[in-house]
């Protein structure tokens, strides 16, 4: 489903994840796990890091793309956009900002471009795209769309409430606009 519109999409979005499935029954594959994927592969194969350490570093870097401090967060594959935790709210904010008003094809292209950009150094250097995401977030916030998005996710019936995600959306666009903490 599309978090922004609340509707099912007509196209498939293929996402990847790397996780240890030995001690788990559920893996939530999401935009974070997808963006971590190439970075984790690079850190493990080229920098000879252990998978667990590579995943932790990649998760911190991916959340850092939008200025979110994920130091104490659970693994990305444990997060759920319908969950109740603060970190679940960060996932929801991250997902909807990347989704924006993009088609599945445009979202796929964006995700691939970001994953390719950050694969070797963990950074995303495309300032124009960062600003376009910030502009979408600012417009959505000022137009009251964040409330509509909350209602979309709640209407799916996956949980009784939707965790607060708006602070992450606002923090990102405030930062990109040079407003600091408002």
Identify the function of each model-found stretch.
Residues 1-182:
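Feature for extracytoplasmic/surface-facing segments of secreted or surface-associated proteins
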């Amino acid at each position: 489903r599309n978090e922004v519109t609340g509707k099912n999409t007509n196209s498939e979005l293929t996402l990847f994840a790397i996780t240890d499935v030995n001690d788990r029954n559920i893996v939530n594959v999401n935009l974070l796990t997808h963006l971590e994927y190439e970075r984790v592969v690079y850190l493990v194969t080229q920098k000879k890091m252990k998978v667990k350490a590579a995943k932790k570093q990649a998760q911190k870097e991916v959340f850092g793309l939008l200025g979110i401090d994920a130091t104490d967060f659970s693994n990305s594959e444990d997060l759920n956009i319908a969950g109740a935790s603060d970190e679940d709210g960060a996932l929801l904010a991250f997902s909807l900002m990347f989704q924006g008003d993009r088609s599945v094809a445009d979202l796929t292209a964006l995700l691939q471009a970001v994953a390719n950009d950050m694969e070797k150094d963990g950074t995303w250097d495309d300032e124009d795209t960062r600003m376009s995401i910030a502009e979408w977030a600012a417009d959505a916030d000022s137009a009251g769309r964040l409330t509509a998005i909350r209602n979309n996710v709640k209407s799916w019936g996956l949980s009784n409430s939707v965790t607060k995600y708006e602070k992450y959306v606002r923090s990102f666009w405030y930062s990109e606009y040079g407003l600091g903490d408002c």
